[in-house]
């Protein structure tokens, strides 16, 4: 598989970003094992209140500064609970951050981990651990609605974007009220505009508030509604022709 880094295509094993993700995946997996957590969902708030960081003999966590973390509005039903879980996951991540930096610098010849947002990357993995997501997503054919039922403490947005950390190539697009909010890929530089197939799926999901999956013109596209009375968000997972086997 190939991912894009600094504007060029590279194999996963040749990319420092891949090494970082594996390091963080392993760290979170160790944390889950020591906390005797063997299946989702992860209640980060309960872990925080239970002082779970002590299981790895880590420093007590601190509430991260706004500059150090990703602040987002999940735009979904139950947003307050999802936000609470995200903040708790970020706070837990602050206690794992030091160990992550030590491992990263050891792996890279004491090169300082400058500019890496460890807290956000770890928090995403606490709510949606890679070793679970990889097998569960494959078994569910990457169905976001079904994944949300399993990883219910994580926002749809986080679950969708975590698919980019898996081996399967795809483009994830988040559309809010008809405007592209995020469009990211693990296999290419995604076109700024939607393909005809993506646009067709988006229009159907937006108008009907129902999931849609289409294979047309070489594109494989699945779309899901995350709709509220005053806000319409759609999330697409697309596989472009050049990324298919």
Label every PLM stretch briefly.
Residues 1-245:
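Active-site hotspot residues in diverse enzymes, especially metal/ion-binding acidic/histidine motifs
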